[in-house]
Amino acid sequence: MVLLGRNPQQLASVAGSLNGGPDAVETLAVAGLSEVPSLIERHRPGVIVNTVGPFTQTGIPLALACLKAGTHYVDLANELDAVLRLLDLNAEAHDRGITIVTGAGFGVLATEALTITLRGEREPALKAQVAALPAVEALGSAVLSSSVDVLAYGGRRYHDGRLVRNRFGADHIRISLPSGGSRQAVGVPTGELEAARRASGAGEVVAYSSEVPSGRIARALLPVMSVVLSVTAIRRQVLRLIEHLRLAPPVSRGEVSWAYARLEWADHSNAEAWLRTGEGYAFTGEVAALVADGLREGSLSAGAFTPGALFGPTLAVRAGAEILLSANKKAMS
C-alpha cells in the first residue's frame, strides 16, 4: 500500500495507524494533484482510492489517469456534478476492462442501500425521497471546500425523469427516527440524488441532507449564498481562503448516524426504511476498504458504478450498518 498526500507528517501518522504499522505502508509526498496522474500512469497500481475533495476537481483527472493505466478507481465523492461526470465514464471504463466506483462512503451508499432494498423486485417507483443524517467527530477543510462546490452548483431535484433546477433550500423535511425524536434536513444536490434515481427508477426524486443548516433563517439565506458562490472568481477566492486558513465546517456530533429512504408507487403504496450505523467517517472508511478489496480481487464487472449498484445493499451491512424497514418488513443486519 502506498499513501500519497501533500503533508509528510500527516502521511506518517496515518501510516502508523494502519494494520501492520508504518513498515508495511509506503508514503509519498507530492506537491499537488497535478503530479498524481503521471505517477498513476508510471506505476500502474491495481487500485487507487481518492479521498481528497473537492471531487469536482480531483475525480475526473485521477479517473482518466486510471483508465490509461489500467487501474481501478474508487472515491468518496458526494457532489452531484462529480458523481454524474464519473458515471459518464461507464462506456470507456467497460471497454478498457476497468471498474470505477464513485461515492464509496456514507454519502451515496447509506441511502442507496435503503433504496435498493425497498424496491426489491418491484416495478420502478413513482417518487423517491432519501436523506443522509450523519454524525461525525470532525470535518476537514476539504469537506468545507466540497460544500462550497455543492452550494455553487445550486438546487437540483428530479422532476418527470429530468434533472431540474430549484431554489436551494426549498425542499425541507423532518424525519422521525426509530429511536425516537426527529431530524431536519434540506434538499441538497448530492450524489445520493442520482443513486436514488437509478436504484428506484422514480421520475420524482429529492435527496436531503442534515449537513446543511435547516433553520428558517438559514434556508432563506441558502439561495443567496448559492448565487454568490456560483460566480467563479468569488468561489475560487473562498476556496483559497479555506485552504490557507484550514477552515472546517461545524459538525453534527453523536454516536449514531442515520439514513432514510421512502418510495411511493403509482398504486399509492409506499415503503420506508432507515439505516443506522456509528460515526460517519468510520463507516466511510470501512466502505472504501471493502470496495478497494473487492476491486483488487478482480472478479467484478467493468464500468462506472455507485457502490450499491455494484455490490448490492449488503455492502452497507458488511461495513457495520443495520437496515430497519417499516413494520411489515424484516430488518437486515
Task: Label each region the model flagged.
Residues 110-114, 189-192, 283-288:
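Catalytic-loop motifs flanking and including active-site residues across diverse enzymes
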